[in-house]
Amino acid sequence: MNIIRLTVWQVPLTSHIAYNMSDGKICDTVATTVLRLDADNGLFGWGEVCPIPHYLPAYADGVAPALIELAPVIFAGDGLGLGVEGMMYAADRYLPGHRYAKSPLDMALWDLTARTAGLPLYALLGGLQTRQLPLYHSISCIDPDEMARIAATETARGITQVQVKLGADRDNAADIARLQLVRAAVPEGTLVYGDWNCGASRLDATRVGRAVADLDVMLEQPCATLDECAAVRDATGLAMKIDENAHDIPSLLQAWQLGCMDAVALKSSKFGGLSALRRARDLCLSLGVKMCIEDTWGSDITTMATVHLGAATPQQGIMNVCDLASYVAPRIAPDAPSRQGGFIAPPTGPGLGITPQDSLLGDPLLELTA
């Protein structure tokens, strides 16, 4: 089997509600990049990556040039014989770095391979181990009372885990109120965690954390470095989830050794695709670290790719996944599963098990042929 065509689209995804994070970062309308690989066996595979502006070392307009550079690897020969991980190893040797741009390529190769095998993608990533995956609901950093209202509404719909965005207004008192009011608004046992997305100083995160240390809450990535996050965890005694600083095996091991990684966000575009994410998943299972398996942003393709990896993970390792597609429009694969209460399940068809609609993608940004 050979890859004979690569097609790339850029699609604007608009959030249903503007998504405010710390340090002035906002998700409103963001370009997602969609990739399709066509093979000479008549099958195809889909991938997607959606970098948030000013968030991580990634940007939407960097994806297509990287794929052009990688064309000699993509069209080199028998991709199925080499395997997805073999092709991605060749891609890493040919073009070091640029993980976010390689992520949709890796995703599409896995989709194509699973379609060729006639199996759902989770069957190739570890088998179906967790059918119903718990979701979290992320709440934009807005007025504390409104955040509490949203939390109550979502938990009434079945959500059992709530992420509270912090730091958008640089107001410690408001962040303390956000955590207190959301915690009070949701049922006992609901997992509540406050996320600064690296935007807090060690001092501010410690002050906020100590003010809510009597509550059943967790903190997420308060500061820009793992050393600072570890210091905040030590000073507050609150469990911590690492996100932005987790991007490869060495960073996971460092966070574990520092004692600040009670949970971790494994995001496809940070690691470079499902191949690397699967290796990170296996390490976290060995360490006993709870995982949120997701990506930075995106629509149905990204959502389903990470849901398949989550479904192929033992239940004791899963903290949650994210139905990114529910936060944005358009839905580019209308047949993709949606949340049912506080859970989501993977499709059972071959590959990703979804059918992105060309009519929703617009004109291609890039077309390459072998």
Positions of predicted regions on the chain:
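Structured beta-strand/loop patches that form or line metal/cofactor-binding pockets in enzymes
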Residues: M1-F44, C50-P57, A325-P330
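Conserved, mostly hydrophobic/aromatic
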Residues: I3, L35, G42, L105, ...
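Metal- or metallocofactor-binding catalytic centers and their adjacent structured scaffolds
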Residues: I3-R5, D38-T116
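Hydrophobic faces of well-ordered beta-strands that scaffold small-molecule active sites
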Residues: G45-G47, R131-I139, T160-V164, V192-W196, ...
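Glycine-rich, aromatic-flanked loop segments that form ligand/cofactor-binding clefts
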Residues: Y100-S140
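Metal-dependent enolase-superfamily TIM-barrel catalytic cores that perform enediolate-based chemistry
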Residues: A123-T236
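Shared catalytic-loop signature of beta/alpha-barrel
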Residues: A224-A239, H247-F343
